[in-house]
């Protein structure tokens, strides 16, 4: 069994925090019109400060502007230009900005090496609880997004959010839905298994997901999902070293994007790199960098992106 655990050295840029969804567990969003938008000049300052400091991936993460909003086009154009900017500075963009149209996904494929969208849970009962004010959390819309990503040959990351009112059966149903779509298109790189962790801004009163159960969920995911999908866990949300290690023993092999700040979970800082290595090495695990696109998908990329990815692979010997 391989004892290699991967992560992506990443930095997150946020076009806007405003979001027309209002998930009761969210620690990220602000109300529409209440959040300023990131300017390209400010984004350039942020990205230039990262040059030659080890960052590979630029994750564009945004609140959602309603599809019918008069600001939707400007929102999308900003996201596109931010990805272009990241590419121009030699970084590799990955975008996760919520529900997109098929044509929007097709456009963003030209400036992203991979994309993502959390499926969270496909049970419709959450639309009466934590997602009752979240129109884009309707399960069939998110499943459609995964289908389109496959049709468009976009390397994709999705995942489950645990502890938001679902059951063990719901976990399995969501994992099986991901498996079925992947077996059709073969495009899903990673599935994130994310425990809900309460923060200072959420409205929902909850103790969060019991992380002691996380190794069990990993084992279930490892059984349900095809072996060519990598299971990812966020180390900043798994504070107990023994739980993190148990998750690895049960099949998790990736720790996601690790950078200065977790925008989605701002109350949970990423672990210090050396401390993480110490925990992993105590059980014979080796932490290694990866790119935000797996090598088996390089040929899916537009030629200009493929060339940039190839330069990174040669530079870091990541194949």
From Swiss-Prot:
UniProt keywords, alphabetically: 4Fe-4S, Iron, Iron-sulfur, Lyase, Metal-binding, S-adenosyl-L-methionine
Cofactor note: Binds 1 [4Fe-4S] cluster. The cluster is coordinated with 3 cysteines and an exchangeable S-adenosyl-L-methionine.
E.C. code: 4.3.1.32
Pathway: Cofactor biosynthesis; coenzyme F0 biosynthesis
Annotated Gene3D superfamilies: Aldolase class I
Domain Radical SAM core: start-end pairs: 5-236
Catalytic activity of the protein: 5-amino-5-(4-hydroxybenzyl)-6-(D-ribitylimino)-5,6-dihydrouracil + S-adenosyl-L-methionine = 7,8-didemethyl-8-hydroxy-5-deazariboflavin + 5'-deoxyadenosine + L-methionine + NH4(+) + H(+)
Transmembrane domains' residue ranges: none
InterPro entries named in the record: Aldolase_TIM, CofG_family, Elp3/MiaA/NifB-like_rSAM, F420, rSAM
NCBIfam families: F420_cofG, PRK06245.1
Function, in words: Catalyzes the radical-mediated synthesis of 7,8-didemethyl-8-hydroxy-5-deazariboflavin from 5-amino-5-(4-hydroxybenzyl)-6-(D-ribitylimino)-5,6-dihydrouracil.
Assigned protein family: Belongs to the radical SAM superfamily. CofG family.
Protein's recorded name: 7,8-didemethyl-8-hydroxy-5-deazariboflavin synthase
Organism per entry: Trichodesmium erythraeum (strain IMS101)
């Amino acid at each position: 069994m391989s004892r290699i655990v991967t992560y992506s050295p990443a930095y997150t840029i946020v076009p806007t925090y405003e979001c027309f969804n209002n998930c009761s567990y969210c620690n990220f969003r602000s109300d529409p019109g209440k959040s300023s938008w990131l300017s390209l000049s400010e984004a350039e300052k942020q990205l230039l400060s990262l040059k030659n400091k080890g960052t590979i991936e630029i994750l564009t993460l945004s609140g959602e502007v309603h599809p019918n909003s008069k600001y939707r086009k400007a929102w999308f154009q900003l996201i596109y230009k931010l990805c272009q900017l990241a590419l121009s500075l030699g970084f590799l963009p990955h975008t996760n900005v919520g529900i997109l149209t098929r044509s929007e996904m097709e456009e963003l494929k030209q400036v992203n090496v991979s994309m993502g969208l959390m499926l969270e849970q496909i049970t419709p009962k959450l639309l009466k609880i934590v997602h009752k004010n979240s129109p884009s959390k309707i399960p069939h819309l998110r499943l459609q997004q995964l289908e389109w990503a496959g049709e468009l040959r976009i390397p994709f990351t999705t995942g489950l959010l645990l502890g938001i009112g679902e059951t063990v059966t719901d976990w399995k149903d969501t994992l099986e839905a991901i498996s079925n779509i992947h077996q059709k298109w073969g495009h899903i790189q990673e599935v994130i298994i994310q425990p809900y962790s309460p923060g200072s801004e959420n409205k929902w009163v909850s103790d969060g997901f019991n992380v002691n159960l996380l190794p069990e969920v990993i084992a279930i995911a490892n059984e349900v999902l095809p072996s060519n999908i990598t299971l990812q866990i966020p180390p900043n949300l798994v504070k107990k070293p023994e739980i993190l290690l148990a998750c690895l023993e049960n099949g998790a092999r990736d720790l996601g994007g690790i950078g200065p700040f977790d925008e989605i979970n701002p109350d949970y800082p990423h672990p210090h790199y050396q401390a993480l290595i110490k925990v992993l090495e105590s059980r014979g695990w080796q932490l290694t960098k990866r790119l935000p696109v797996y090598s088996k998908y390089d040929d899916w990329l537009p030629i200009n992106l493929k060339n940039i990815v190839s330069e990174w692979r040669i530079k870091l010997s990541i194949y």
